[in-house]
Amino acid sequence: LTEELRTFPINAQGDTAVLSLKEIKKGQQVFNAACAQCHALGVTRTNPDVNLSPEALALATPPRDNIAALVDYIKNPTTYDGFVEISELHPSLKSSDIFPKMRNISEDDLYNVAGYILLQPKVRGEQWG
């Protein structure tokens, strides 16, 4: 994976960071362990209308198309329109008592998972989301 492919927006202001191959690999491992059951290939099993494609992430409220926004969502998930907190329905750090797979996820893991999610459309194209 080239540095260009591993460069992602880290915030809404457009600042970027390059994730290492190790960070991408760790993000993949955590995604596969904690997220892929419902989000394999970027699809949302419980709601196919909302997926992890760049377009869907950008159109969410607030937009979830950067690392900080995805990390925030994993900590405190809300509906696509941003109005309703859904941590009892969607795995998150806030609901780790209900969703045990979230219990041992670190801040670094969240960062790496977000990078992994943002990488997938670059390498999988239309097969993601």
UniProtKB/Swiss-Prot annotation:
It holds the Pfam family Cytochrom_C550. One of its GO terms (molecular function) is heme binding. InterPro entries: Cyt_c-like_dom (IPR009056), Cyt_c-like_dom_sf (IPR036909), Cytochrom_C550 (IPR029490), PsbV_cyt_c550 (IPR017851), PsbV_cyt_c550-like (IPR016003). One of its GO terms (biological process) is photosynthesis, light reaction. SUPFAM superfamilies: Cytochrome c (SSF46626). Gene3D superfamilies: Cytochrome c-like domain (1.10.760.10). Keywords: Electron transport, Heme, Iron, Membrane, Metal-binding, Photosynthesis, Photosystem II, Thylakoid, Transport. It is a peripheral membrane protein. Its cofactor is heme c. Binds 1 heme c group covalently per subunit. One of its GO terms (cellular component) is plasma membrane-derived thylakoid membrane. Heme c binds at residues 35, 38-39, 90. Its main location: membrane. Signal peptide: none annotated. It comes from the Bacteria. It is found in: Cellular thylakoid membrane. HAMAP family: PSII_Cyt550. One of the extrinsic, lumenal subunits of photosystem II (PSII). PSII is a light-driven water plastoquinone oxidoreductase, using light energy to abstract electrons from H(2)O, generating a proton gradient subsequently used for ATP formation. The extrinsic proteins stabilize the structure of photosystem II oxygen-evolving complex (OEC), the ion environment of oxygen evolution and protect the OEC against heat-induced inactivation. Low-potential cytochrome c that plays a role in the OEC of PSII. Belongs to the cytochrome c family. PsbV subfamily. PSII is composed of 1 copy each of membrane proteins PsbA, PsbB, PsbC, PsbD, PsbE, PsbF, PsbH, PsbI, PsbJ, PsbK, PsbL, PsbM, PsbT, PsbX, PsbY, PsbZ, Psb30/Ycf12, peripheral proteins PsbO, CyanoQ (PsbQ), PsbU, PsbV and a large number of cofactors. It forms dimeric complexes. Homodimer in crystal structure. NCBIfam families: PS_II_C550. This is Photosystem II extrinsic protein V. It comes from Limnospira maxima. The lineage of its organism: Bacteria, Bacillati, Cyanobacteriota, Cyanophyceae, Oscillatoriophycideae.
